[in-house]
Amino acid sequence: MKALIESIVASLVDYPEEIVINKTEEESKVVYHLTVHPDDVGKVIGKNGRIAKAIRTVVYASKTDGNKRIYLDIM
């Protein structure tokens, strides 16, 4: 899942080397914390959050962690 998120986000940002993805796993959910360069935050979120919503939709649709709910937190 980290590779999927990184490949999507890397094509959007100017500083792909500064992409950091941390995974926090709990009983019923998995949270991926995405951190990018401050200049790239707007590109990842997009106008009215459209790009962030599209990334989240792809991540949610490709979940591989069984019955756990997946969340993507963009910082």
From Swiss-Prot:
Gene3D superfamilies: 3.30.300.20
Key word Cell wall biogenesis/degradation present: yes
Keywords of this entry: Cell shape, Cell wall biogenesis/degradation, Chaperone, Cytoplasm, RNA-binding
Domain KH: 29-75
BP GO annotations: cell wall organization; peptidoglycan biosynthetic process; regulation of cell shape
GO molecular function: RNA binding
Top-rank lineage group of the source organism: Bacteria
Stored InterPro entries: KH_dom-like_a/b, KH_sf_prok-type, KhpA
Statement: the UniProt record of this protein carries the keyword Cytoplasm: yes
Subcellular location: Cytoplasm
Assigned GO CC terms: cytoplasm
Subunit description: Forms a complex with KhpB.
Family, per entry: Belongs to the KhpA RNA-binding protein family.
Functional summary from the UniProt entry: A probable RNA chaperone. Forms a complex with KhpB which binds to cellular RNA and controls its expression. Plays a role in peptidoglycan (PG) homeostasis and cell length regulation.
Name the record gives this protein: RNA-binding protein KhpA
Organism this protein belongs to: Oceanobacillus iheyensis (strain DSM 14371 / CIP 107618 / JCM 11309 / KCTC 3954 / HTE831)
Upper taxonomic lineage: Bacteria, Bacillati, Bacillota, Bacilli, Bacillales
